[in-house]
Amino acid sequence: MAKIDLSNFDKIIVLDFGSQYNQLITRRIRDFGIYSELLPHTITAEEVKKIAPKGIIFSGGPNSVYDENALDVDPEIFELGIPILGICYGMQLMTQKLGGTVEKAGEAEYGSAHIEVKEADSPLYKGLPEKQVVWMSHGDLVTKVPEGFEVLASSKNCPIASMADPDRKFYAVQFHAEVRNSEYGLDILRRFAFDVCGAKDNWTMDDFIKLSVDSIREEVGNANVILGISGGVDSSVTATLLHKAIGSQLTAIFVDHGLLRKNESDEVMAALKEGLGVNIVRVDAKDRFMSKLAGVTDPEKKRKIIGNEFVQVFNDEAKKIKDAKFLAQGTLYTDVIESGTDTAHTIKSHHNVGGLPEDMQFKLIEPLRQLFKDEVRVLGEKLGLPHDLVWRQPFPGPGLAIRVIGEITEEKLRIVRDADAILREEVKNAGLQESIWQYFVALPGMRSVGVMGDGRTYDYAVCIRAVTSIDGMTADFAQIPWDVLQKISVRIVNEVKQVNRVLYDVTSKPPATIEYE
C-alpha cells in the first residue's frame, strides 16, 4: 500500500543514529500534533529537500564519532537552511561536522545529572528554570563548540551540555530530552518544534482517517480484501478502517483457536460484526489446535505449532473468497522501523498471516503502517470501537498457550481463563486498569498442599503477573494495594476449581521477561 499523502502536514524528521530512544523522539513530536518520521541517517540532502520538513532531529547513538565505522550524515544537510536539533551523539556529530572538537570524557555520565542554563533567553530554554535535572548517557563530550556557536548549558562533568548557533537555527543537547527523566525535556522539544522550527500542530487523527479511506478506495478499486483477525487491537482497528473504506469488499477471517481469554471470541464478534457490520468469517478451530498441541511442553514448539496451524486454517478459508486481490495486515510503524527496510511488499512472518503459499498472489495493504500503538488506540476510538476492546491488555499471539507452562489441556485453560477473568474484573473495580501496563494470570504447572473445609487438597497454584512500564522494554512489578490482592486471591481460591494457592510475581524486567514462555 502506498503511503498516504502527507504533503499538507508540517513535518519534523528524526535521523536514526542507533539510539534506543529513537522511536520515543518520533512519538514525542507526534504527541505535539506534528507529524514525524524516523529516517535512516544515510538520507541525502536532496531526499530531505523533497520531504520539506520544518525541522530535523539527529538522534543519539551508541557509537563515538571517532569510531572507524561511526554513523555519518550528508554534510549538505547543514546547507539546507532547515533547523536542526542534535541529541547526545547527534550533538557530537554536529560538532565534528561543523569544525568543533569532541573528546573522550574523563568521567562518563550515565543517569541523572544537574545542568545550569547559561543563556536563559535562548528559544530552547526561555521560561524554563535555570537549574534542571536531565538524563545523561555518554562517554564522549564536546570540548570546543564550532564557530558561530554559543554554550547554552553545562553540568558538573559536562561543561558544554547544550549549544546553539541561533543564526542558522542549529541547536544541540548532550542529554536525552526525549525521556521523562529529563524534567523539562518535553518542554525543550516543544520549544524546538514550535518556536525554532515554526511547525504547526496540524497532524490530527480525523485527517488521517479521511486520507486513509481515500487512499484505500483508490488502490483497491472494486477488488476484494482479506484480513486475518486475531482478536487483538491492531487487527480489529485495521478491520474497522478497511470496512469504513470499502464495506463488503472486506472479508475478515477470525481463526478461533480456543486460546483466547474468557468470552474474548464473542466480544470480538459482537464489536466488529454485530456492532459495526464488518463481514467476518469465524472459524472454530479449537479441536484442531488442541489435537496438534497434545503432549507438547516445549514453549518454542508450542509457538511453531500454533503459528503453522493458524496459517493453514487461514489459507483454507482464504481460498474460498473469490476475486480477493489484497491481503491486509495490522503492521504498525514500529514494525516498519524495526525491519530497517521498506516492508510494503513483504508479508510479516508472524503467526497471523505469515508463511502464505507462493501460489496465493496478493498485494499487501497495511493501513496502519504509519501509526504507533498509542495512535492506533486513538484511531480505534475515533472509528467507534468499544473502549474496552481498544484499550485491552497486550496479548501474545499464541494466546494462553504460553501462560500455561508445560502441556496444554482443556482443564488448565479453564483454570487460567477463570482466574484471569477475576483478576481483570477486580483490577477494573479498583480503578487500576489504566495505571498498570499489563496484568494476567499464569499457570506455572505446580501443585501444592492446602486445606479447604475439613479436608486436605493437592491442587494448582496460579501466579499473578502485573507490571508497570512505558514501552514494554523494561518493566517493574506493579505495587497493587494489598487489600486488592487479598480480594483477588480470596475470589480465585473460592471460585476457581482446583486452585488452592495464589502467588504474586515481584520480579522486574530484566532479569525476567513479562511473559513466562
From Swiss-Prot:
Enumerate the spans annotated as Glutamine amidotransferase type-1 domain. 11-202
Please give the Pfam families that the UniProt record associates with this protein. Answer: GATase, GMP_synt_C, NAD_synthase
User: What's a GO cellular component annotated to this UniProt protein?
Assistant: cytosol
Annotated residues for binding of ATP:
S230, G231, G232, V233, D234, S235, S236
Q: Which Gene3D superfamilies match?
A: 3.30.300.10, 3.40.50.880, HUPs
| Zinc-finger in keyword set | no
Q: Tell me which InterPro entries the record gives.
A: Class_I_gatase-like, GATASE, GMP_synth_C, GMP_synth_GATase, GMP_synthase, GMPS_ATP_PPase_dom, NAD/GMP_synthase, Rossmann-like_a/b/a_fold
Ranges where the GMPS ATP-PPase domain occurs? 203-392
Keyword flag Mitochondrion:
no
This protein's UniProt keywords: ATP-binding, Glutamine amidotransferase, GMP biosynthesis, Ligase, Nucleotide-binding, Purine biosynthesis
- Domain of life, per UniProt, equals Bacteria
Q: What is its EC number?
A: 6.3.5.2
Q: What GO molecular function annotation could you give as one example from this UniProt entry?
A: ATP binding
Report which reactions are catalysed by this protein.
Answer: XMP + L-glutamine + ATP + H2O = GMP + L-glutamate + AMP + diphosphate + 2 H(+)
Quote the catalytic residue positions: C88, H176, E178
Instruction: Report the pathway entry.
Output: Purine metabolism; GMP biosynthesis; GMP from XMP (L-Gln route): step 1/1
State the function annotated in the UniProt record: Catalyzes the synthesis of GMP from XMP.
Q: What HAMAP family does this protein's entry cite?
A: GMP_synthase
Task: Quote the protein name from its UniProt record.
Answer: GMP synthase [glutamine-hydrolyzing]
